[in-house]
Amino acid sequence: MAAAGSATRRVGFVGAGRMAGAIAQGLIRAGKVEAQRIVASAPTDRNLCHFQALGCQTTHSNQEVLQSCLLVIFATKPHILPAVVAEVAPVVTAEHILVSVAAGVSLSTLEELLPPNTRVLRVLPNLPCVVQEGAIVMARGRHVGSSETKLLQHLLEACGRCEEVPEAYVDIHTGLSGSGVAFVCAFSEALAEGAIKMGMPSSLAHRIAAQTLLGTAKMLLHEGQHPAQLRSDVCTPGGTTIYGLHALEQGGLRAATMSAVEAATCRARELSRK
């Protein structure tokens, strides 16, 4: 479907938590979908308040969302998603495109719960979607074509960078980018605390640390450089940076970070098998 067509499409959300709200807000801010053409459901009004403030329609009926919208994003907790999908299955049609953002629930599980040939995709966003700077991957089910994939990618680019991947990469993305937000925060905190130790005020140190991460990330993305090249560019013989990098290597930063991604990925795979 052409990009222009997505502006008039109705988008539904089953589940109205923080991630659902972030995606909806991104769609609205980017002009991808008009607020009044978004319908969200949740058991209580607590989470729906954010959608109502955005100008979206809300309901307590999950089936009503599917009866109103052909593109529906399931943003419930993973452990209740199978029950929710089974609940709405009677109103699913061949026209629906269903998207799950729940970690640990496979495409095959979703397809088994839905009518034959239902078009299903998995999307794994991360927390920076809240500020429209998310890292998002999506994997398509057996009955999804390139047009549906392009439509969803076009919409989700309102929330950050969106890449299509094989489903096998989804758990790795959880370890790299979902959990990676916490890893980066831990490094940012340590970076700032090093400056605090040397005498810089706390608030200033944390602002500069965050800005350093932001600026570095933009250089890596916009210039397409490998991190090793940028790291080398910053180093001068006998300078401050190479001394600092030596200290990081002595502390095992590189190995510890790789192990963190591995551990988080293995845990994601373990949860997927339950």
Swiss-Prot record:
Subcellular location: Cytoplasm
UniProt catalytic activity: L-proline + NADP(+) = (S)-1-pyrroline-5-carboxylate + NADPH + 2 H(+); L-proline + NAD(+) = (S)-1-pyrroline-5-carboxylate + NADH + 2 H(+)
Pathway in which this enzyme or protein is active: Amino-acid biosynthesis; L-proline biosynthesis; L-proline from L-glutamate 5-semialdehyde: step 1/1
Keyword Acetylation listed: yes
GO cellular component terms, A-Z: cytosol
SUPFAM superfamilies: 6-phosphogluconate dehydrogenase C-terminal domain-like, NAD(P)-binding Rossmann-fold domains
Keyword terms, alphabetized: Acetylation, Amino-acid biosynthesis, Cytoplasm, NADP, Oxidoreductase, Proline biosynthesis
Sites of N-acetylalanine modification: A2
MF terms (GO), sorted A to Z: pyrroline-5-carboxylate reductase activity
EC number: 1.5.1.2
GO biological process: L-proline biosynthetic process
Chief location: cytoplasm
Pfam families named in the record: F420_oxidored (PF03807), P5CR_dimer (PF14748)
Gene3D superfamilies reported for this sequence: NAD(P)-binding Rossmann-like Domain (3.40.50.720), ProC C-terminal domain-like (1.10.3730.10)
Job description of the protein: Oxidoreductase that catalyzes the last step in proline biosynthesis, which corresponds to the reduction of pyrroline-5-carboxylate (P5C) to L-proline using NAD(P)H. Proline is synthesized from either glutamate or ornithine; both are converted to P5C, and then to proline via pyrroline-5-carboxylate reductases (PYCRs). PYCR3 is exclusively linked to the biosynthesis of proline from ornithine.
Similarity-based family: Belongs to the pyrroline-5-carboxylate reductase family.
Quaternary organization: Homodecamer; composed of 5 homodimers.
Protein name, as recorded: Pyrroline-5-carboxylate reductase 3
